[in-house]
Amino acid sequence: MSGNTYGKLFTVTTAGESHGPALVAIVDGCPPGLEISLADLQHDLDRRKPGTSRHTTQRQEPDEVEILSGVFEGRTTGCSIGLLIRNTDQKSKDYSAIKDLFRPAHADYTYHHKYGLRDYRGGGRSSARETAMRVAAGAIAKKFLATQGIRVRGYMSQLGPIEIPFKTWDSVEQNAFFSPDPDKVPELEAYMDQLRRDQDSVGAKITVVAEGVMPGLGEPIFDRLDAELAHALMSINAVKGVEIGAGFASVAQRGTEHRDELTPEGFLSNNAGGILGGISSGQPIVAHLALKPTSSITTPGRSIDVDGNPVEVITKGRHDPCVGIRATPIAEAMMAIVLMDHLLRHRAQNAEVKVGTPVLGQL
């Protein structure tokens, strides 16, 4: 079956292609009475949309969302919420030369083998254009989570070889890179300018954090919260790796270093990333995403055509030299969708559970 829906109680279904007339989403399971407006959704869409700086694709899409159903007089009704974003700046002719060729490291080859045909215009369904609907749906989840005291936000923690230390959340929304260190922005800009001159691309690392999450979210064994987050975050285009907490750094740690010891005042560390045994611990939930460099570059690359003949591919069109630059709001959206789904699932099963043990924060 097609994998176009995520969630159990709070579900998000998307449809649409990069060069189709529109993108759509159906969001189901949102409790009634939640105050929601177009501005709530548009804020995150504007953070993600293309053409916002010289360091991203110059495709000009306003990404103005329309709410078709499920909201009446500014509040959710409890019925399915229909969302629509119209595509307005397609240039399909840019792709006519490669309609019978497979771009290296793209989904062209695998979509062709799976379905027997493919929409070659901008990648069709495999394009990251689809993630606009995830961001719109995620904005609804964020709004609901905020009523429960939960905040989800992210930042870029590495661009290519440049590591970006966390300094302040205030900086994240003040630059095109979502950098938490304002002093790094000139270096990032210079690196991206040189990358464009080299006609190349680069990967990135995004960190996303959820604060205020209560203990208890997650459904062992197969729907562990960390497993669900990894699933959701890995579904984002170009993501090739996900870490929870210390992640792969845990390999080099000893148990005395890695274990998050507890005191009456709180946890002494958070190597687990806020999840123990697949269940949220009450600490901040921390995930890191590795995004590959896009292979949509003008440097020629070797490939084959649909008949298996060797060819050289040069990708035209408008592309992000670093897809990670616009990935922060997408990662936030997917984490918010997972957390809302699990909060509703936890409430359904365990609403009557009362525990006298205090909820610990992190020192």
Swiss-Prot record:
Keyword list (alphabetical) reads: Amino-acid biosynthesis, Aromatic amino acid biosynthesis, FAD, Flavoprotein, FMN, Lyase, NADP
Its GO biological process annotations read: amino acid biosynthetic process; aromatic amino acid family biosynthetic process; chorismate biosynthetic process
Residues annotated to bind FMN: 125-127, 237-238, 277, 292-296, 318
Binding-site positions, NADP(+): 48, 54
Which pathway does UniProt place it in? Metabolic intermediate biosynthesis; chorismate biosynthesis; chorismate from D-erythrose 4-phosphate and phosphoenolpyruvate: step 7/7
Q: According to its UniProt record, which cofactors does this protein need?
A: FMNH2
Q: What is its EC number?
A: 4.2.3.5
Key word Cell inner membrane present in the record? Answer: no
Please share the entry's free-text remark on the cofactor: Reduced FMN (FMNH(2)).
Q: Does the keyword Lyase apply?
A: yes
Please provide, alphabetically and separated by semicolons, the GO molecular function terms listed in this UniProt record. chorismate synthase activity; FMN binding
- Transmembrane stretches, start-end: none
Query: What domain of life does the native source organism fall in?
Result: Bacteria
Q: Name one GO cellular component term.
A: cytosol
Catalytic reactions on record: 5-O-(1-carboxyvinyl)-3-phosphoshikimate = chorismate + phosphate
Which InterPro entries does this entry report, sorted A to Z? Chorismate_synth, Chorismate_synth_AroC_sf, Chorismate_synthase_CS
Provide the function of this protein: This reaction introduces a second double bond into the aromatic ring system.
State the similarity comment: Belongs to the chorismate synthase family.
**Subunit and partners:** Homotetramer.
Query: Which HAMAP family does the protein's record reference?
Result: Chorismate_synth
Show the PANTHER family listed in the entry.
CHORISMATE SYNTHASE
| Name of the molecule in the record | Chorismate synthase
Instruction: Report the source organism.
Output: Pseudomonas entomophila (strain L48)
